[in-house]
């Protein structure tokens, strides 16, 4: 049996990149300051990096799945060029009220459901209790809780923080950029 590894689960829009709303083109994709360095440091610390992102714009007809895949490939290569290798990218193209029939459905992968997390856990042998979820919305925290992710981290770089999201989170940080230091501080012996 493969040894399980801890992971950092990462929402995309508002966590890795600035959320300009239905981001689907390279020209509109802007990495948030400090996140690439943080991701590199988290890899050095022994974490797998796994993106888990709702992409309802596909179901809503705002952009195609092919456009999303092109942008995702570009993001993955951009990170790899900066010595950040993602271990997995999981996305949900569905929405119950989508205008594109193929993707109009209730599914178990759309956050707050844990489907993407559980798929990653099984495929990558992730130790969920030792893992972290980083996101900017309540649904990110709820999905992480449903998947038994050990630490739920809410960041201020995306949507405005709601009291519900703050209550569902274990930690609230200004940015993903602050996570490596926060983990190191927590792991220091008292």
From Swiss-Prot:
Protein localization: Cytoplasm
Required cofactor names: Mg(2+); Zn(2+)
GO process terms (BP): ADP-L-glycero-beta-D-manno-heptose biosynthetic process; lipopolysaccharide core region biosynthetic process
GO MF annotation, one: D-glycero-beta-D-manno-heptose 1,7-bisphosphate 7-phosphatase activity
Reaction equation(s) it catalyzes: D-glycero-beta-D-manno-heptose 1,7-bisphosphate + H2O = D-glycero-beta-D-manno-heptose 1-phosphate + phosphate
Gene3D superfamilies hit by this protein: HAD superfamily/HAD-like (3.40.50.1000)
Name this protein carries in UniProt: D-glycero-beta-D-manno-heptose-1,7-bisphosphate 7-phosphatase
Organism: Escherichia coli O6:H1 (strain CFT073 / ATCC 700928 / UPEC)
Upper classification of the organism: Bacteria, Pseudomonadati, Pseudomonadota, Gammaproteobacteria, Enterobacterales
């Amino acid at each position: 049996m493969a040894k399980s590894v801890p992971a950092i689960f990462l929402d995309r829009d508002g966590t890795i990149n600035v959320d300009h709303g239905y981001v689907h083109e390279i020209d509109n994709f802007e990495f948030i300051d400090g996140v690439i360095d943080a991701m590199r440091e988290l890899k050095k610390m022994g974490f797998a990096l796994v993106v888990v992102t709702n992409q309802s714009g596909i179901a809503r007809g705002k952009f195609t799945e092919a456009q999303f895949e092109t942008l995702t490939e570009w993001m993955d290569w951009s990170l790899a060029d900066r010595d950040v290798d993602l271990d997995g990218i999981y996305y949900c193209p569905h929405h119950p009220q989508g205008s594109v029939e193929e993707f109009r459905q209730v599914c178990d992968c759309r956050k707050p459901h844990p489907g993407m997390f559980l798929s990653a856990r099984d495929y990558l042998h992730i130790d969920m209790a030792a893992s972290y979820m980083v996101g900017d919305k309540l649904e990110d925290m709820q999905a992480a809780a449903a998947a038994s992710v050990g630490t739920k981290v809410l960041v201020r770089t995306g949507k405005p923080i709601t009291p519900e999201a703050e209550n569902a989170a274990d930690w609230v940080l200004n940015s993903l950029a602050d996570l490596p230091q926060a983990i190191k501080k927590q792991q220091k012996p008292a």
